[in-house]
Amino acid sequence: MKLGPGKKAPDEINVFIEIPMGSNIKYEYDEEEDIIKVDRVLYTSMVYPFNYGFIPETLEEDGDPLDVLVLGNYSLMPGTVIEARPIGMIYMRDEEGEDAKVIAVPRNKTDPSFSNINDVKDLPEAIRNKIVHFFEHYKELEPNKWVKISGWGSVAEAKERIKKAIERKKQG
């Protein structure tokens, strides 16, 4: 994939969408094959509350690109890219270790509906609760899988995480 993290990263980022809002299928981008594959159907009767993907040309310590949940009122097709603004982080661990995710909203030019949201603290409590509930429960029926949420991070923490993930990828 030739797409980078975004010309204005970490303030605005490219997010490659793997999983559309409302899907109960976990898709994953296979970098080697350059295709999106079905990883699995969620075992729980849940759907992704928002569009989910990653920032291209980033690398987390677990060897994967930095994950992003993009808030919105519409479902995006897998394989599309949306320019988004990070507004914070959700810190979590799963059976494989730390698995934090950036929380983002579409950039104002793409969708001005979120122009007043600059930090996860600005989100209605109901939306924060929906995100936590999804990630706490979406793996519950899968053998030997679990998730533990440890809290929220600010927009500054998200931008720092993005910078580090970009640098880690550049260093190889």
Swiss-Prot record:
Catalyzes the hydrolysis of inorganic pyrophosphate (PPi) forming two phosphate ions. Gene3D superfamilies: Inorganic pyrophosphatase. It catalyses: diphosphate + H2O = 2 phosphate + H(+). It is an enzyme of class 3 (hydrolase). Mg(2+) 1 binds at residues 62, 67, 99. Mg(2+) 2 binds at residue 67. This is Inorganic pyrophosphatase. It is found in: Cytoplasm. Homohexamer. Substrate binds at residues 26, 40, 52, 138. PROSITE patterns: PPASE. Keywords: Cytoplasm, Hydrolase, Magnesium, Metal-binding. The keyword rRNA-binding does not apply. It comes from the Archaea. The gene is ppa. GO terms for cellular component: cytosol. Transmembrane segments: none annotated.
